[in-house]
Amino acid sequence: MRTRAAVALEAGKPLEVMEVNLEGPKAGEVMVEIKATGICHTDEFTLSGADPEGLFPSILGHEGAGVVVEVGPGVTSVKPGNHVIPLYTPECRQCASCLSGKTNLCTAIRATQGQGLMPDGTSRFSMLDGTPIFHYMGCSTFSNYTVLPEIAVAKVREDAPFDKICYIGCGVTTGIGAVINTAKVEIGAKAVVFGLGGIGLNVLQGLRLAGADMIIGVDLNDDKKPMAEHFGMTHFINPKNCENVVQEIVNLTKTPFDQIGGADYSFDCTGNVKVMRDALECTHRGWGQSIIIGVAPAGAEISTRPFQLVTGRVWKGTAFGGARGRTDVPQIVDWYMDGKIEIDPMITHTLSLDDINKGFDLMHAGESIRSVVLY
């Protein structure tokens, strides 16, 4: 069949909206009509050419929601008509990683997904002249129709709006999950969030959901403060307005009963390795945990004095918020529908597919939290 898609023909160039060929689902695969997709910084990272694993031509997009229209042989967990969220981190429930119970990083299709291909080593997309087009993160939601492995779709309730729950496909789950699944923040905790963009806002509301007592936001842009407060931030620090952000946080978290000070948990949402060091060193001696969410540039390295770790601090990383996609994503949709979490204020712009490049422009200008393309 033919479908409209925004194709990344080469690095550093705007996406081109065109008709492409899409082959139907093979065994263990499903075809999904994408109804809405977010535009994420990861898409921009690849399109810019900075992604060492970036492939072209490809159809980007990994933050979508839609309806199953066709299933291949052997598919049992979804059927046509089901509403789903594509998963760039699948959940096969059979590989060593899934069965370990210790990680959400399923390895079932990792090798082919990283090559922009389906599990059988081929692509379902091609140009009208037959030139193959690579898949992206196993999702390719910048196409009106896409084909995914069955293990890479989460079945969700049918009364949830596509234009909001698409954000659960990446940003919402990444931020909230880092709090709930990775850090396991407890009631009454003191926490710091570095970087108050889309991911940071979701970390904030994850902390609010978990019952954190003091929620400190750190950002160089004072304009981020009102929205951050809306999502649960209790204190704001602009590093430009203090001599030493680590000492500022330590002082802010001291109490009459604890003159050591330091956050119980910190979260880096910046991808800046210098900020990652501050995020670790502002945590409490003996038990502080710092969670790295932000993706650093290729080849970047983190550093701190080993003494920081020997004295009880822990550095952790997280991907997709530690969420097991098919199991956890439907629950996060329920949280949204039940009013436990918010998404609507973060969807600042809605666009047509023809205007998709405007979404990247808004991102570059810092004018959007999340732009969503509606099909």
Curated annotation (Swiss-Prot):
Domain of life: Bacteria
Residues given in the record as Zn(2+) 2 binding sites: 92, 95, 98, 106
Note on cofactor: Binds 2 Zn(2+) ions per subunit.
Chain residues that bind Zn(2+) 1: 40, 62-63, 170
Positions that bind NAD(+): 41, 195-200, 219, 293-295, 318-320
Swiss-Prot/TrEMBL catalytic activity: a primary alcohol + NAD(+) = an aldehyde + NADH + H(+); a secondary alcohol + NAD(+) = a ketone + NADH + H(+); S-(hydroxymethyl)glutathione + NADP(+) = S-formylglutathione + NADPH + H(+); S-(hydroxymethyl)glutathione + NAD(+) = S-formylglutathione + NADH + H(+)
A molecular-function term among this protein's GO annotations: S-nitrosoglutathione reductase (NADH) activity
GO BP: any one term: formaldehyde catabolic process
Enzyme class: oxidoreductase
Cross-referenced Pfam families: ADH_N, ADH_zinc_N
InterPro entries noted in UniProt: ADH-like_C, ADH-like_N, ADH_3, ADH_Zn_CS, GroES-like_sf, NAD(P)-bd_dom_sf
EC number: 1.1.1.284, 1.1.1.1, 1.1.1.-
Required cofactor(s): Zn(2+)
Keyword line: Metal-binding, NAD, Oxidoreductase, Zinc
A GO CC term assigned to this protein in UniProt: cytosol
Regions annotated as coiled coil: none
Matching CDD domains: alcohol_DH_class_III
Subunit structure: Homotetramer.
PANTHER family xref list: ALCOHOL DEHYDROGENASE, ALCOHOL DEHYDROGENASE CLASS-3
Protein family: Belongs to the zinc-containing alcohol dehydrogenase family. Class-III subfamily.
Function: Oxidizes long-chain alcohols and, in the presence of glutathione, is able to oxidize formaldehyde. Also acts as a S-nitroso-glutathione reductase by catalyzing the NADH-dependent reduction of S-nitrosoglutathione, thereby regulating protein S-nitrosylation.
Protein's name according to its UniProt entry: S-(hydroxymethyl)glutathione dehydrogenase
Taxonomic source organism: Paracoccus denitrificans
